[in-house]
Regions:
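Short cysteine/histidine-rich metal-coordination sites, predominantly Zn2+-binding motifs
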Residues: 30-41, 138-151
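Short cysteine-rich clusters marking metal-coordination/redox-active sites
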Residues: 15-18, 125-128
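Short, charged low-complexity linear segments at domain edges
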Residues: 1, 87-111
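Residues immediately within or flanking Cys/His clusters that coordinate Zn2+
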Residues: 9-12, 122
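Charge-dense, extended regions
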Residues: 149-177
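Short, non-ligating residues that shape and space the ligands of small metal-coordination modules
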Residues: 24-25, 131-135
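Long intrinsically disordered, low-complexity regions that are acidic and Ser/Thr-rich
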Residues: 41-93
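Eukaryote-biased detector of low-complexity, proline/serine/threonine-rich segments
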Residues: 117-126
Length: 177
């Protein structure tokens, strides 16, 4: 994922282990962020009329596409002009973006999640240092960064990061505006 600008989201939640309130942070991307997508197991019949084994531009969605006829894979580098996104399960992040995030929280660092069975950058409780898993915060409706009411959304404070790009290997989903 790449974006020419980003926002650090800040909120608070109860730690699952010690039950004390702890600050948590996330990364929001504004419209026009770019992301890479890989589609495996594509049937050659679905490629009819496509340019094979060469990158080419597309207009809808806007970006670049490569149909690999030898591996039956589609590689896409797309731009999202319509919606904001929030990152989760961040496996890698550019060092300059991470240093800005760490100015807000020293408790955002890589840890292994037994639930997700992977290592990713995660929030940790400021009291007991327990990892605060991304799923409940970012992917579960009603989670701190997945508000379902305007009252929940008002609890999120956005810090705009100016003049800094972000590169990340992460999941993303459309953020509710």
């Amino acid at each position: 994922i790449f974006s020419q600008r980003f926002y650090i989201a800040e909120s608070y939640q109860s730690c699952w282990r010690c039950k004390k309130i702890t600050p948590v942070f996330g990364v929001f991307l504004p419209r026009w962020f770019s992301y890479r997508d890989v589609v495996c197991g594509v049937k050659p019949a679905e490629w009819e009329g496509r340019i094979l084994d060469k990158w080419y531009e597309t207009s809808s969605p806007r970006g670049m596409v490569y149909f690999d006829s030898k591996k039956n894979i589609i590689y896409q580098w797309l731009t999202n002009p319509k919606a904001w996104a929030i990152l989760s399960n961040v496996r890698r992040i550019s060092s300059s973006a991470l240093s800005i995030i760490n100015k807000h929280s020293k408790l955002y660092y890589p840890a292994y999640s037994k639930t997700a069975k992977m290592t990713y950058y995660a929030n940790h409780c400021c009291h007991c240092k327990s990892m605060q898993g991304d799923f409940m915060m970012f992917d579960e409706p009603g989670g701190v960064f997945y508000p379902v009411t305007s009252e929940q959304a008002k609890k999120i404070k956005l810090h705009e990061v100016i003049n800094e790009t972000i590169f990340a290997n992460a999941n993303h989903r459309q953020a509710i505006e």
